[in-house]
From Swiss-Prot:
The gene is aroA. It comes from the Bacteria. GO terms for biological process: amino acid biosynthetic process; aromatic amino acid family biosynthetic process; chorismate biosynthetic process. GO terms for molecular function: 3-phosphoshikimate 1-carboxyvinyltransferase activity. Phosphoenolpyruvate binds at K20, G92, R120, Q168, R343, R385. Keywords: Amino-acid biosynthesis, Aromatic amino acid biosynthesis, Cytoplasm, Transferase. It is found in: Cytoplasm. It catalyses: 3-phosphoshikimate + phosphoenolpyruvate = 5-O-(1-carboxyvinyl)-3-phosphoshikimate + phosphate. SUPFAM superfamilies: EPT/RTPC-like. Its main location: cytoplasm. The active site is at D312. Pathway: Metabolic intermediate biosynthesis; chorismate biosynthesis; chorismate from D-erythrose 4-phosphate and phosphoenolpyruvate: step 6/7. This is 3-phosphoshikimate 1-carboxyvinyltransferase. Pfam families: EPSP_synthase.
Amino acid sequence: MKLKTNIRHLHGSIRVPGDKSISHRSIIFGSLAEGETKVYDILRGEDVLSTMQVFRDLGVEIEDKDGVITVQGVGMAGLKAPQNALNMGNSGTSIRLISGVLAGADFEVEMFGDDSLSKRPMDRVTLPLKKMGVSISGQTERDLPPLRLKGTKNLRPIHYELPIASAQVKSALMFAALQAKGESVIIEKEYTRNHTEDMLQQFGGHLSVDGKKITVQGPQKLTGQKVVVPGDISSAAFWLVAGLIAPNSRLVLQNVGINETRTGIIDVIRAMGGKLEITEIDPVAKSATLIVESSDLKGTEICGALIPRLIDELPIIALLATQAQGVTVIKDAEELKVKETDRIQVVADALNSMGADITPTADGMIIKGKSALHGARVNTFGDHRIGMMTAIAALLVADGEVELDRAEAINTSYPSFFDDLESLIHG
């Protein structure tokens, strides 16, 4: 696919699609609750559609009509054995969270995904689930998919310290803990996105959070709710960066989720001197309007507790850093290696091929700016965030063409991405 290059400005206002993390969880909680759940503004990307189909395969009635998703919850014990193996597509969120959901189901399932998912380690979630009494195994010692799982009605509670910062593992264990008899304690290594904690309480569940310690008493019952999904800050991130680095630009992004566990990119933009305004804050929905303008940027250091708050935004932040004066250092981000691709290497290779100066490290990157970018051919390797990062980088290219291979990967999280890009180019 040939990308737009050498644009003179970006202007306009858009609403980014619904938050992917919240969209997944709204389907999961709605399925496990008793009664009806209605979900508004859900993301209809391929990952979330995979989660919806899996729960249909598990016997849940899910209707998509007039822009609203209606889930007829079956309760914690109401899932039924599927006729066939469960297809998780490209979605690491789906396979990990649903492993926890099925921990208390007294039937056997096989879960598989596409080529990318089949390379992602699942031992981080299979190990603690085994401690709870679940029979679960995959391929090689890292438990790569496909996974075979047989849950148990006699699920044991767990006291577990996460060896990595992972909202997916935390959430899988919380879903399992809701079905175990007794008190489970999950201790995070670093604070990660807390959508599961928030939504558990929204659906009538109970937990206590004391710093990084989460305590869940099981078993519990949940009740169907109305869920309004805010815009995804991980999708908004591409426009935030585009507005900062494109010339003569001003972008308004409406209804963006600003949950404090997800706003690391806002902290980075401010540290780099970017012009960013936050208005129309809705404290209940945890959403706001974000406004960015073309800015002179400086390098910064991104590490430690900040990393889990922007892990999915690091590819586009790397592009931002190529347009900042000085050096930007990203470290403590080894988790990038086990995303849809090895994002440390793939981001460095993609942007370096366009003229950037990025040195990959064991746990991040060293990025020297400011770089003039030129044409190149870039492969997404099936990674949606690499595709969108490259499309934004192409906007700055004055010399040559940018070809993007496997651009369809973008449909994973943002099917309307190129439509929104066109509207901003012509805004």
